[in-house]
């Protein structure tokens, strides 16, 4: 009977250890996925920022050109 108890406790202990290891790996994978998502969103933000900056420059140049033609026409 004592041998059976020890075996059951050993099986339960090993099961808990393996379960905790699996949970830890799962948390690590979730953290890695979150970091990848953060990196992708930062890249998208930088892309939009650069695109808007370029549009702003073009709009400024167009406005400056229009003002120069109006001043030159007078």
Swiss-Prot record:
It is found in: Secreted. Residues 23-43 form a propeptide. GO terms for cellular component: extracellular region. Disulfide bonds: none annotated. The keyword Metal-binding does not apply. Expressed by the skin glands. Its main location: secreted. InterPro entries: Dermaseptin_dom, Frog_antimicrobial_propeptide, FSAP. GO terms for biological process: defense response to bacterium. Transmembrane segments: none annotated. Residues 1-22 form the signal peptide. Possesses a potent antimicrobial activity against Gram-positive and Gram-negative bacteria. Probably acts by disturbing membrane functions with its amphipathic structure. Belongs to the frog skin active peptide (FSAP) family. Dermaseptin subfamily. This is Dermaseptin-B3. It comes from Phyllomedusa bicolor. The lineage of its organism: Eukaryota, Metazoa, Chordata, Craniata, Vertebrata.
């Amino acid at each position: 009977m004592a041998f059976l108890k020890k075996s059951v406790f050993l099986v339960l202990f090993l099961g808990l250890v393996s379960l905790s290891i699996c949970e830890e790996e799962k948390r690590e994978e979730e953290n890695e996925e979150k970091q990848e998502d953060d990196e992708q969103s930062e890249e998208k933000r930088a892309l939009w920022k650069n695109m808007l900056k370029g549009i702003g420059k073009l709009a400024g140049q167009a406005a400056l050109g229009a003002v120069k033609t109006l001043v030159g026409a007078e």
